[in-house]
């Protein structure tokens, strides 16, 4: 019997979940004969390295149609996305299985100690040290601590590997409309792009972030009356300001009290500042604060999150000279003036490595301000198999608070479990036996496996977030007690198993936990 032609898998979103899923399809000996993945992302192509050869490669392109050119590997670098991501063993394991362990260890930064403090934003107030967890992120099973990456750096690693394996990545491809179409090969989805082009795919994968347009389409298929209400994640009474700063841009006269390699969490009267090391002597910082109301969603462009953050706006020259960090604030759902006012209130907050928050801001090259939302969508809201085959991955399927620490790890898990389900239900043997393409069984089991784990993690993230904010005396007491009771013993000396959810080990051949 003739081997069936590979099914086209259209993946909307080329950040983390999308490229990871594509890598599973491209590397597995069975899946690569059954599926042909194509990544689409609305972001522009990565900035080219300024060489004549790279310019020539980019201008020639490698696509098969107008506006469908793929970016050549090894000749480009991804712009800094302005945020970092952390990976624990459950997120690292699938990537290690894909043969990326050496690259991840080279490009990531392994975290060791975590110091907990209490601080105030008034001038002259010193930090109070609560506890230091020695090698607080250590995994005895992996013999490795948590790894932190700049988000764009991890994306570049994955996308470049996709291209090296002959995969396709289409930049500047904003998906604007989806419709089911019939074909001789079965049910398909036509994806229409803003540039006027379109493509038919056998499986549509939404890996396009918390404000996923693929999810919006899927929810409209389920119930147009409730689609918009179900589409927007729930506001959690919290706002977050994130940045990436450079340790090398600090004043030469400054002597840090604590080492660069140490992660810090400073509890405020309400909220907290968390910082941690990243590759290239960069460090991330997250300022998490309570907020009573979120920005009006209709006043901002709530579309799928771009893989590359927008370019910061430039303030007037006089303001920029007085407060150079203003130029690093990227346009978003909040007015720049609102973000700036919050940051000004925290300038005098002390920090063990930078000295104070103002020094941290001054060395920032990108600052992002966003309301913090969370929702775990139902099983039938993350997959559709009626007149077409659609499935969601990562933040498109479940958006969690940053206090989960697992947004990226769970996205990688999603990609791995979905690939495993395709292998289980879409085998060549089933196709030859006259069965349908197997998408229905694969997508339904994927959703059934993922939702309980997502719900548990979201509940934990919400609880940690509430306690971390310390909005009431009760939560302040819980926060203080939890910090003081944090084990100070070096975890490298303990042979404890990884706790949930870090103990998850997902493989394409099977899924677990």
Task: Please identify what each model-predicted range represents.
Residues 156-365:
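Conserved FAD-binding catalytic core of PHBH/FMO-like flavoproteins
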Residues 25-30, 218, 222, 422-426:
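Active-site catalytic pocket residues across diverse enzymes, especially alpha/beta-hydrolases
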Residues 2-10, 106, 127, 405, ...:
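C-terminal helical "tail/cap" subdomain of flavin- and related membrane-associated enzymes
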Residues 11-24, 205-206, 241, 347, ...:
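Conserved mid-domain beta->alpha element of the FAD-binding
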Residues 44, 211, 398:
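Short, glycine/acidic-enriched loop or turn micro-motifs at the edges of active sites
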Residues 48-161, 165, 468:
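Active-site-adjacent segment of FAD-dependent monooxygenases/related oxidoreductases
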């Amino acid at each position: 019997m003739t081997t069936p032609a590979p099914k086209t898998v259209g993946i909307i979103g080329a950040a983390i979940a999308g490229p990871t899923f594509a890598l599973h399809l491209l590397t597995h000996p069975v899946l690569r004969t059954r599926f042909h993945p194509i990544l689409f992302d609305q972001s522009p192509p990565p900035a080219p390295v300024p060489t004549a050869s790279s310019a020539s490669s980019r201008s020639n392109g490698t696509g098969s149609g107008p506006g469908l050119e793929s970016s050549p590997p090894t000749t480009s670098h991804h712009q800094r996305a302005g945020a970092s991501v952390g990976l624990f063993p459950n997120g690292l394991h699938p990537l290690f299985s894909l043969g990326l362990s050496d690259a991840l260890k080279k490009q990531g930064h392994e975290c060791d100690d975590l110091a907990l403090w209490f601080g105030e934003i008034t001038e002259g107030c010193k930090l109070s040290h609560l506890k230091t967890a020695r090698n607080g992120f250590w995994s005895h099973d992996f013999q490795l601590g948590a790894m932190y990456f700049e988000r764009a750096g991890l994306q570049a690693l994955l996308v470049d590997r996709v291209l090296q394996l002959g995969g396709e990545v289409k930049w500047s491809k904003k998906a604007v409309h989806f419709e089911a179409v019939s074909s001789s090969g079965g049910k398909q989805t036509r994806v229409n792009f803003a540039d006027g082009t379109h493509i038919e795919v056998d499986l549509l994968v939404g890996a396009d972030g918390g404000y996923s347009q693929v999810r919006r389409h899927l929810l409209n298929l389920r119930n147009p009356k409730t689609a918009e209400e179900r589409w927007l994640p729930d506001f959690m009474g919290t706002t977050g300001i994130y940045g990436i700063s450079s340790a090398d841009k600090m004043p030469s006269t400054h002597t840090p009290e604590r080492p660069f390699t140490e992660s810090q969490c400073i509890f405020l009267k309400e909220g907290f500042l968390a910082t941690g090391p990243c590759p290239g002597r960069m460090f991330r910082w997250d300022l998490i604060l309570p907020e009573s109301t979120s920005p009006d969603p209709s006043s901002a462009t709530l579309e799928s999150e771009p893989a590359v953050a927008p370019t910061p706006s430039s303030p007037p020259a006089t303001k920029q000279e007085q407060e150079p960090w203003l130029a690093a604030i990227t346009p978003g759902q909040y007015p720049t003036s609102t973000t700036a006012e919050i940051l000004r209130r925290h300038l005098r907050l002390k920090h063990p490595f930078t000295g104070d928050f103002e020094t941290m801001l001054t060395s920032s090259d990108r600052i992002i301000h966003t309301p913090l939302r969370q929702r775990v969508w139902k099983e039938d809201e993350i997959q559709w198999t009626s007149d077409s085959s659609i499935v969601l991955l990562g933040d498109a399927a479940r958006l969690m608070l940053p206090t989960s620490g697992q947004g990226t790890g769970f996205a990688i898990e999603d990609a791995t479990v979905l690939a495993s389900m395709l292998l289980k239900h879409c085998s060549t043997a089933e196709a030859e036996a006259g069965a349908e393409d197997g998408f229905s069984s694969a997508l339904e089991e994927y959703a059934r496996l993922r939702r309980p784990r997502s719900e548990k993690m979201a509940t934990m993230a919400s609880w940690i977030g509430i306690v971390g904010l310390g909005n009431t005396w009760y939560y302040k007491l819980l926060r203080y007690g939890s910090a003081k009771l944090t084990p100070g013993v070096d975890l490298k000396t303990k042979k404890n198993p990884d706790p949930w959810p870090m103990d998850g080990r997902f493989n394409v051949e099977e899924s677990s936990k």
